[in-house]
Amino acid sequence: KIKPSVVYTHHSGDLNIDHELTHRAVMTACRPQPETSVKQIYSFEILSSTGWFGYAQQKQYIANKYIDISAYLEQKLEALRAYDTEMREVPHARSYDNVEYLAKHRGASVGLHAAETFFVERWVEGESM
């Protein structure tokens, strides 16, 4: 039986309904029950989905965890080539240039060359769970 301690999912504020439902399913599956192994849940942002929902407070993406990806930015962009049919030309938010821009912008906001951000949905410390 798989017992993950960390789970990554779409943000609840993604405009894509499948992303929103995925988030809801993950949060439901990872209910904080005594037998759960999940101690950390992070949601991530997707250009052309997360920021397009609107600015209702409960749906707003707020980056509160930053991971330095400076050494891996080129690998990230190369990995996106597997989804080439999903990518668009500039000025579309989901262009290679804008994915790179966002990583550099997120990094610059915390003194790094590039960063991936997450919203911490849950963070539990200790062994009692």
Regions found by a protein language model. Give the residues of each.
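Metal-dependent de-N-acetylase/amidase catalytic core
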Residues: 1-129
